[in-house]
């Protein structure tokens, strides 16, 4: 819900939401407002399988977002160049540009979803459980990629996750919510080392320790 409010898909019923100094408490009512917000804030969904149009080639996925949010009017050749530039940024070489989503693995699809978001050159990317559907080894690759992109492009992330190990790896600051209320917040490393709220302590205690193995039944 918080993510949907930030991108303008939900109206705030109490309190305020501010993005880059601008009040975003009201849902975007007009197409122009939605485009302005989308240029500022892009969204990467949890499911890399349903978030892409299965009939649209990867190059077209990226180019459509480039075309929608470009401040100039790039021609076909320039759009192709920019699309490949964005795909290069997420580690997908030229051979992927003509492929369909069904030809890609889950990790590759999520790279495409990240590239689609970056095509708008946003200030903020909302990642809603963006690695939860991926294998652990692929999760690590995507998290490392996101860290590199953040450093290179100076983009901020709102990373929504229930996995504290993932949160610890990707975030600088952490907010803990319980039943829609903020119950804890602060520097991620400090908060995980010394949680103050009972709910945060319970979350931390639920994380398996090193060498953990499931019990046999």
What are these regions (language model features)?
Residues 7:
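Helix-to-loop junction immediately C-terminal to a conserved catalytic motif
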Residues 23-42, 60, 68, 76, ...:
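ABC ATPase NBD coupling module
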Residues 77-95, 204-205:
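Conserved ABC ATPase "signature" region
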Residues 100-104, 108:
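Conserved ABC ATPase signature
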Residues 121:
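Conserved catalytic motifs of ABC-family nucleotide-binding domains
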Residues 167-169:
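A short, surface-exposed alpha-helical micro-motif characterized by mixed small hydrophobic
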Residues 182-186:
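ABC ATPase "signature
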């Amino acid at each position: 819900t918080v993510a949907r409010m930030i991108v303008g898909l939900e109206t705030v019923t109490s309190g305020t939401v501010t993005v880059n100094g601008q009040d975003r408490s009201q849902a975007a009512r007009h197409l122009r407002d939605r485009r302005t917000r989308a240029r500022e804030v892009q969204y990467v969904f949890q499911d890399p399988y349903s978030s892409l149009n299965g009939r649209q080639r990867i190059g077209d996925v990226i180019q459509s977002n480039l075309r929608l949010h470009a401040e100039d009017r790039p021609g076909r050749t320039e759009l192709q160049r920019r699309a490949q530039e964005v795909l290069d940024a997420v580690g997908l070489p030229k051979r992927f540009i003509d492929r369909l989503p069904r030809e890609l693995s889950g990790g590759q699809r999520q790279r495409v979803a990240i590239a689609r978001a970056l095509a708008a050159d946003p200030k903020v990317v909302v990642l809603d459980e963006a690695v939860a559907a991926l294998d652990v080894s692929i999760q690590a690759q995507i998290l490392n990629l996101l860290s590199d992109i953040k450093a290179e492009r100076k983009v901020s992330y709102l990373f929504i996750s229930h996995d504290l190990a993932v949160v610890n790896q990707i975030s600088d600051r952490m907010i803990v919510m319980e039943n829609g209320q903020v119950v804890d917040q602060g520097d991620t490393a400090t908060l995980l080392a010394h949680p103050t709220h009972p709910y945060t302590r319970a979350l931390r205690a639920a994380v398996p320790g090193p060498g953990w193995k499931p019990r046999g039944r």
